Amino acid sequence: MNMSQKMAAEFLGTLWLVLGGCGSAVLAAAFPEVGIGLLGVSLAFGLTVLTMAFAIGHISGCHLNPAVSFGLWAGGRFPTSELLPYIIAQVAGGIAGAGVLYLIASGQEGFSLAAGFASNGFGEHSPGGYSMISVMICEIVMTLFFLLVILGSTDERAPKGFAPIAIGLCLTLIHLISIPISNTSVNPARSTGPALFVGDWAVSQLWLFWAAPIIGAILAGVIYRYFNAAK
């Protein structure tokens, strides 16, 4: 596959992740009165990755996440030359996904971006009121384990064909743990799209949801290299 094909796949895949994951939170979490709730939103995020892994995994590897690209790079599984193009495509896809979601959601009477639009936050903008430090630790640790699952399940020595399931279930588990803490990022592209529409506090806090996932991902890549060095 050439780079334009890979970038197109990453763009569409990340658009689907934001539309499916954030869309479930914005459109369905509290509908009609009970809605799908935390469990449903968590499953939605996992399902977006699982479905796209089968759809575009053979084209781009289905990163859909700058942290995943950084983690694979740190683990020696992704070339430096492709890092920036992938991240550009992922961020563009995240913004486009948020744009499609906004076009849909804004058609409902009473819709307001003030409700958060599935943005990530800390302090008063954390769903559970968690501090910046708590959110930082959570995002680093969650992304670290996410990347360990990705690196391990896609290793040539791992059982074939099960990686999308393991990765999708891992992302679901991560959301079950961390939605109350940070609204769950582990993905700078997922955070960027909604934040740009909300503006204000969501943009001012966006730095954490770039820094923490990338730190966690790189740590996972280093750990993965250590495991392989022991072979």
From Swiss-Prot:
Sections of the chain in a coiled coil: none
BP GO annotations: water transport
Gene3D superfamilies reported in the protein's UniProt record: Glycerol uptake facilitator protein
Motif window: NPA 2: 187-189
Reactions accelerated catalytically: H2O(in) = H2O(out)
Assembly, per entry: Homotetramer.
Purpose: Channel that permits osmotically driven movement of water in both directions. It is involved in the osmoregulation and in the maintenance of cell turgor during volume expansion in rapidly growing cells. It mediates rapid entry or exit of water in response to abrupt changes in osmolarity.
Protein name (database record): Aquaporin Z
Provenance organism: Shewanella oneidensis (strain ATCC 700550 / JCM 31522 / CIP 106686 / LMG 19005 / NCIMB 14063 / MR-1)
Annotated gene: aqpZ
